[in-house]
Every structure is written in C-alpha cells, then in structure tokens.
Amino acid sequence: LPPSSAASDVYKRQVVSLNAPGFIGNRMLFGYTAQANMLLLEGALPHQIDQALESFGLNMGPFRMMDLVGLDLGWRARKLSGKESPLHAKIGDELCEQNRYGQKNGAGYYNYTEGSRAPNAAPENEELYERISQENGFTRREISDEEIVDRCILALINEGANILSEGVAQRAVDIDVVYINGYGFPIWRGGPMHHANAMGLDVVVEKLNKYKELTGNDVYKPSELLVSLAENNLKMGDAPAKADRKEKLGFEMSSVANNF
C-alpha cells in the first residue's frame, strides 16, 4: 500500500519530516516542557501550570504528562552517563531521588491512588520546590496564568519556526497537523503555527523579546524566520520552502541540549 493509504487504514494523519533528532513534535515538546519546569523553579506550582494550559485548551498539562510518561527516564539516563542535571530538570531529578517517579509508583509531581490516574495535590513536594529554587539562585515569585501560557506556547511557536526554517518540516500546516493529532493541541486554535498567525507575528516577536529579556533564555530569541515574516506582514504559511533539505543528524539548540 502507498503510505497515504496505510496511514488512513489505521486512522493516522501523516506529514513529511526530515530525518532529524526529535523530528517535529518531540523537538518542540522539549522546549515546552523545559519552560514548564523553569516556571516551577521560578515560583509556579504544577497544578497551576497544568490548569492554565488546560484552560488554554491542551488535553493535558505538562506535569500530568510527565507523571504519565515517568519522571525517571531522563534521570536514569543522566545517572548512567554521569551527566549533571540541566537546570530545568533539577526538581524532577530530585523527586526521583525521593522515589517519586510518577503514576507508575503513585507519586510524582502529584499523588495517585491505586488504580486511578486522577492527579491529587502533593503539598509535601512544596518544601522541595523551595529548596531547589533557592539552591539554584531563584527567589520564588507569583506567576500569572497569562505568563505561564505565553511562555510555554511561545516556546512551541518559536521552535516550530526554527524547524520550518531548517526544512525539517516542509510547511507550517504540517507542524499544526502534528500538534493537533499527536500532542493534544486544541483543534479549535488551529495548531501552534496557526495560533501564531492569529496572535499576529509582530505580537509574537514582541512577546518573545519580552521573555528573552525577562529570563535570559535563548529559547525566546525570536527565530529569524518569524522576524522576517513579521517585518513583511506575512503569515507562517508564506514561509519560503527550503530547497536543500538534508538530514540533520545533530544540531545545537537551547531547547534541546542536555534534555536527556
């Protein structure tokens, strides 16, 4: 069967991706979850972050998702390789040191009762959050739901633009198809690239610069593609196709480096 027929037979949607680390969806997810963890270090709590993003329309917030997948996967890999925990993984790795691995053993960012996947608050973790934040130079602060949504969704949008400019994805709509069908992005928002258009690319660039100044994190350094499209009053769908698409077996980027 041709690929399109095979995909349809198992009720899947397909897009073409360059052979590259993380492909499209997971590469964007790395930066998204890293920023959720940075918000936790800075003062927000898991349930607040999850509720803000679920209110935006995502099927599942990042901390519920990480508990579902298992907090110990990256932690065990880092221990085996002798790598130090990256900043955004400090809290998750410390939870693992305390045998809190997520749903698999009933305790992670949330607590779980036997036989249930419903998350319950874990106030006993808050002392750990305070300690890890302080040890890493953060004074915890009040963080608004607006900042939570902005920082997590902008991380997706900016990395999506980088993926598009590198030719890893051929079209902005392909990125939207991946995120709506595979990552729980709200269909009524059209996907992260369509949502960027709805926000206005000039607004997206302005907000990215704002959070780059606030956090110093290069994940918010506006993609050159975004800047160019915004300056020319264009949309994500107007991005020029990349003719010399070659597989990328490695790359350097702030949102992916040291995630594992």
PLM-predicted stretches and their roles:
Residues 1-7, 11:
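Single conserved hydrophobic/aromatic residue that forms the stacking wall/gate
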